[in-house]
Amino acid sequence: EVEVITCLGEYDSYEELIRESLKPNIKLNVIHRTNSPTTRKSRFVEQPYVRKMFEVYFFEDSPLDENTQKQLDKCIEDKIREFDLTIVTDFGHGMISDSTIDILEKGSRFLAVNAQSNSANHGYNLVTKYPIADYICIDAPEARLAVADKYSDIEVLISEKLTREIHCPNIAVTHGDSGCITYSKGEGIDS
């Protein structure tokens, strides 16, 4: 059983398409964001190599208004203890506030976080805004941004610097063609 809690736009919601695309075991809980479209990204690619040329975002990335934030937080708080695993995919588009993070940290049995730094949030969405998690998965540039370190060896950066910023016993950092590097408290780095 899987439940998804998300915000969709008040207009251009694509809610029908989203609901039709879900597997039968997935329940969608929607909070509608006022005066906003559903976040959508269109990529323009060069054929035949499918190389991304540019992308256009349709979204509102300011924080949710107070009423919508309260609805979202209540929905999460009401459901979080029912599940063995909470997976947060935070794209930095204004949905997840400090109050939401507090609920996630206190209520989750196991909290897995992916907080993305991307061209739309300009690096303002660092994984360090989650001081406590059971597992985080980010890419190497996101790990570097999180600890403001462009040059250190990635293994040192993860095992010494990132672990000082986030209380998290399990970390995976994807590293492009090199695969990924994992850290587990007590076992250290595995690459």
Where are these regions (language model features)?
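Ribokinase/PfkB-type carbohydrate-kinase core domain
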Residues: 1-191
